Amino acid sequence: MIPLLKNPHFELIRHDVSIPFQAEVDEIYNLACPASPVYYQIDPIQTIKTSVLGAVNMLGLAKRVNAKILQASTSEVYGDPMIHPQPESYWGNVNPIGPRSCYDEGKRCAETLFMDYHRQNKVRVKIIRIFNTYGPNMSTNDGRVVSNFIIQALQNKDITIYGDGNQTRSFQYVDDLIEGMIRMMNTS
């Protein structure tokens, strides 16, 4: 982030996306919402408001200024999938009322809003489903598998695997994610 702050063409604006926002922009990357259960379960109502109201507000901005907009969704929209790996056409096996639903269903609803804004208002939307991202400066206490494994290994502890050990995960390095988001935004 520090190199960006030195760029004269970059401006960092802190704003709650659940509140409408006015700006003149060409592209919007809607990345708002904590992705770790440790953080999003602290205030589940605010979590779902961030996803749903944030999508409505950012889509409204994109419509007003004719900007392209990218929604950062999640692999969690698949729930506990019955198919591995999941094709994009797979709708998932979800629990709409569980303790993680504030995040999962908020992202599903945001995807729906994005497609509806595209169909109804011709807003140029992009949706990506992010899986387990790792890299420098990641939080060590967010309760996700990569950080848990690293901390346990550094502390010379046994690596904890929940379940029967047959689970599968897709991982992506943060630099690859950023490059992928930029490439996706630049597609027609």
Predicted feature descriptions by range:
Residues M1-T133, A153, G163, V174-N186:
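N-terminal Rossmann-like NAD(P)+-binding domain of SDR-like oxidoreductases, especially those catalyzing
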Residues T160:
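Nucleotide-binding/hydrolysis machinery
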Residues A55, V146-S147:
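Amphipathic alpha-helical segments in well-structured domains
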Residues N148-L154:
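Activation segment of eukaryotic-like protein kinases
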Residues P136-G143, G165-E179:
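Substrate-binding strand-loop-helix patch
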